[in-house]
A protein has these predicted regions:
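Anionic ligand-binding catalytic core segments
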Residues: 1-68, 72-73, 77-168
Length: 168
């Protein structure tokens, strides 16, 4: 599943991704409370399902390159089969309104960036996560790919987001 967004007046909001599916959304908060530690979250998810743990790595990597400062345990979760209780996937990525453009242009340099440091330290200290992340073989985005995505954003962006993302 992919989160879909729509304009709501002057705002962008996430469409309800549970409406047309047969699964319940369960926030990570229900499993780990307010513990936002990447390693603790990854280890718990990995103990349940390694494929979903890989999706979690992609989620926090995306947060890192897009400066999403609002990834707490109520802002991501799982789709659960209500009949069996099985967790079937990570919920679509949602609630990204704090990322990149919400607070104006981002400052550079990135060598002191807390998000990059948190992600790097997490991978350095969690060997399972590090090996899994390597196996994902995530390729860098090109400026053209980023600009193509930006063309689909229905708001005016007053500075070069592509350069900011590429600098990270």
């Amino acid at each position: 599943l992919t989160a879909e967004y729509e304009m709501d007046g002057g705002y962008i909001r996430t469409k309800d991704f549970k409406e047309s599916v047969k699964y319940n959304h369960e926030p990570m908060f229900s499993l780990i409370d307010e513990d936002e530690d990447y390693s603790n979250n990854f280890n718990l998810i990995h103990s349940m399902n390694s494929s979903i743990a890989a999706d979690y790595l992609k989620l926090i990597y995306t947060d890192t390159i897009c400066c999403n400062t609002d990834r707490h345990t109520d802002n991501y979760g799982f789709l659960r089969n209500p009949d069996t209780g099985e967790i079937v996937s990570l919920s679509p990525n949602y609630d990204n309104n704090i990322a990149l453009i919400s607070n104006g242009p981002l400052g550079l340099p990135n060598e002191n960036d807390a998000f990059i440091e948190l992600f790097v330290v997490f991978l350095k200290n969690n060997i399972t996560a590090k090996e899994m992340f390597k196996s994902l073989n995530i390729q860098p985005l090109s400026k053209q790919e980023i600009e193509e995505c930006i063309q689909h954003v229905p708001i005016k962006i007053g500075y070069d987001i592509a350069d900011i993302i590429l600098s990270r």
